[in-house]
Swiss-Prot record:
Molecular functions (GO terms): DNA binding
Keyword Transcription included in the entry's annotation: yes
InterPro entries recorded: Integrase-like_N, TACO1_YebC-like_2nd/3rd_dom, TACO1_YebC_N, Transcrip_reg_TACO1-like, Transcrip_reg_TACO1-like_dom3, Transcrip_reg_TACO1_YeeN, YebC-like
Keyword Transcription regulation set for record: yes
Main location: cytoplasm
Protein name per the record: Probable transcriptional regulatory protein YeeN
Gene3D superfamilies cross-referenced by the UniProt entry: 1.10.10.200, 3.30.70.980
Subcellular location(s) per record: Cytoplasm
Record gene name: yeeN
Organism this protein belongs to: Salmonella choleraesuis (strain SC-B67)
Keyword set, alphabetical order: Cytoplasm, DNA-binding, Transcription, Transcription regulation
Origin superkingdom: Bacteria
A biological process from GO: regulation of DNA-templated transcription
Family, similarity comment: Belongs to the TACO1 family. YeeN subfamily.
One GO cellular component term: cytosol
């Protein structure tokens, strides 16, 4: 899974570079999680998980606090999750996950992006069956065998544990991500660089320079949309 890990890192690094976009999108996600439950991370596990991910992305405390305070203050916006799937050139596939207060606006924007950027939007499920919903946990370390034993003892459903460039990279069944994190914390591991649910392509394609330019434009436009939280694809050389 080394290539998959490299793609996740590349995507995360690219998105982290656009700091204002990252902060705004985490602000929305934190607000939505706080509104759906208690605005206290100690009693709202979904909110706690989002805050942990925001800290991994170096979102400042004041951005996190502002989103929680907005939820506490009775903000009346309601956000709905969505997923849009489609195709780029030569077997390329893309999934955009959204969080929006205006579904009609989001649908219109996503359709426009696909139409203008050389893609074709598909029906629900058109490409997601070619991706595996996977828990990904990353932290500094060099002994994957020891980590695998910890997870095995905790009965975590693990797909793979590898060492990549001084990092332990764990892939779990999506339903066992939080169980895996808890097992690692119980073993004394508390600093994580990534704890995410990722849609990982079962197989990847490589695009020609011309097709890659088109596909990159599609992915960039989707990621730039304010309502899009995450974008997944199956292109190995992007």
């Amino acid at each position: 899974m080394g290539r998959k890990w490299a793609n996740i890192v590349a995507k995360k690094t690219a998105k982290d570079g656009a700091t204002s976009k990252v902060y705004a999108k985490f602000g929305v996600e934190i607000y939505a999680a706080a509104k759906q439950g208690e605005p206290d991370p100690e009693s709202n596990s979904a909110l706690k998980f989002v805050i942990e991910r925001a800290k991994q992305a170096q979102v400042p405390k004041h951005v996190i606090d502002k989103a929680i305070d907005k939820a506490k203050g009775g903000g009346d916006e309601t956000f709905v999750q969505g997923r849009y799937e489609g195709f780029g050139p030569n077997g390329s596939m893309v999934i955009a996950e959204t969080l929006t207060s205006n579904v009609n606006r989001t649908i219109a924007n996503i359709r426009t992006i696909f139409n203008k950027k050389g893609g074709n939007i598909g029906a629900a499920g058109a490409v997601s069956y070619m991706f595996d919903n996977t828990g990904v946990i990353v932290f500094k370390g060099t002994d994957p065998d020891h980590i695998f034993e910890i997870l095995l003892d905790a009965e975590v459903d693990v797909r793979d544990v590898t060492e990549e460039e001084g990092n332990i990279v764990i892939y779990t069944e999506a339903t066992d991500l939080h169980k895996g994190i808890a097992a690692l914390k119980a073993a004394g591991i508390t600093e994580f660089s990534t704890t995410e649910l990722e849609m990982i392509a079962q197989s990847e394609v490589e695009l020609s320079p011309e097709d890659l330019e088109i596909f990159e434009g599609l992915v960039d436009a989707l990621e730039d949309d304010d309502d899009v939280q995450k974008v997944y694809h199956n292109v190995a050389n992007l």
